[in-house]
């Protein structure tokens, strides 16, 4: 457990020069390359070697929830129970200090427009950004009210070169959606900013400081209870309530994965194929420091 004295980045810097490999670095890729303007400069929110993200800005930051219940696409059923997810997530994020905005049933163009507008805002006084999407999905695509779109449309505009006021800050994406139609039958296991600091400036990759959490692994089904909400959101909200101000986010998400994997099993006795199925979330982290939603200090 971390106490109120946890260091959020106000540490004495250590003058460690950027590691070089003596030349000869090559990329493991074919074809032409494009650059993301590496010479752009953004404000340094935390010392170069700080172990924790600075979560002591004036505001925690924006939390955006795209909640999809109904669709114009005839093949997609209404997502009964998603409002439970949206309400529970909104409540727990507010307790962690986020400014939460919920958007129900937006069309693809509306989502894209709001994402771009958010990226153009000044996030200098914010700790981080959080985006959650509750919807139907398939492998490599999510559904808006009217059509599908690629998941990376959600974070494309928030890379450090496009949104410099979030450079060096956590950008978190939680996606509750199927990633395919494969089922997991499981297996039984038996017992046999700191201004004025002496730290020098440093460069970071534009895709650093992202975390993307999908409710299930690529190609697989994601389960939702029509009364209690989706398994992933139930577990995420419970862990955020229990230890959101104490555990770092990757440790917390490890226990979310544990809860989904062990505590949930589909109950569909009328369908042998769908009955007693399992699920586990899939976490991709480009975070470069530990992230803890510690209690906000007064400013």
Curated annotation (Swiss-Prot):
GO biological process, one term: apoptotic process
Molecular-function GO terms, alphabetical: cysteine-type endopeptidase activity
E.C. code: 3.4.22.-
Pfam families assigned to the protein according to its UniProt record, in alphabetical order: Peptidase_C14
Enzyme's top EC category: hydrolase
Region named Disordered: 1-45
PTM notes: The two subunits are derived from the precursor sequence by an autocatalytic mechanism.
UniProtKB keywords: Apoptosis, Hydrolase, Protease, Thiol protease, Zymogen
Signal peptide as annotated in the record: none
Domain of life of the native organism: Eukaryota
SUPFAM superfamilies attached to this UniProt entry: Caspase-like (SSF52129)
One cellular component term from this protein's GO annotations in UniProt: cytoplasm
Transmembrane domains' residue ranges: none
Active site: 136, 178
UniProt propeptide residues: 1-28, 185-195
Subunit structure of this chain's protein: Heterotetramer that consists of two anti-parallel arranged heterodimers, each one formed by a 19/18 kDa (p19/18) and a 12 kDa (p12) subunit.
Protein family membership: Belongs to the peptidase C14A family.
Function of the protein: Involved in the activation cascade of caspases responsible for apoptosis execution. Inhibited by the baculovirus anti-apoptotic protein p35. Cleaves p35 and nuclear immunophilin FKBP46.
This protein's name: Caspase-1
């Amino acid at each position: 457990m971390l106490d109120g004295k946890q260091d959020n980045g106000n540490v004495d810097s250590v003058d460690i020069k950027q590691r070089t490999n003596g030349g000869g670095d090559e990329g493991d890729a074919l074809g032409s390359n494009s650059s993301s303007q590496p010479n752009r400069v953004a404000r340094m929110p935390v010392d170069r070697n700080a172990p924790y993200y600075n979560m002591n800005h004036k505001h925690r930051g924006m939390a955006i929830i795209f909640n999809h219940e109904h669709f114009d696409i005839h093949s997609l059923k209404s997502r009964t129970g998603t409002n439970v997810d949206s309400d529970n997530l909104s409540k727990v994020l507010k307790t962690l200090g986020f400014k939460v905005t919920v958007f129900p049933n937006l069309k693809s163009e509306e989502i894209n427009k709001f994402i771009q507008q958010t990226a153009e805002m000044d996030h200098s006084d914010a700790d981080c950004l959080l985006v959650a999407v509750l919807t139907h999905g398939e492998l490599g695509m999510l559904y808006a009210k009217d059509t599908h779109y690629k998941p990376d449309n959600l974070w494309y505009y928030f890379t450090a070169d496009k949104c410099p006021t979030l450079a060096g800050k956590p950008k978190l994406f939680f996606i509750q959606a199927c990633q395919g139609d494969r089922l997991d039958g499981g297996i039984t296991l038996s017992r046999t900013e700191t201004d004025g600091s002496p730290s020098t400036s440093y460069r970071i990759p534009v895709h650093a400081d992202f975390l993307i959490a999908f409710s299930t692994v690529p190609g697989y089904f994601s389960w939702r209870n029509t009364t209690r909400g989706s398994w992933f959101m139930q577990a995420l909200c419970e862990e955020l309530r229990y230890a959101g101000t104490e555990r770092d986010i990757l440790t917390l998400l490890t226990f979310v994965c544990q809860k989904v994997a062990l505590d949930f099993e589909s109950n569909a006795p009328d369908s042998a194929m769908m009955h007693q199925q399992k699920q586990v979330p899939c976490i991709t982290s480009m975070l470069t420091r530990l992230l803890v939603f510690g209690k906000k200090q007064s400013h």
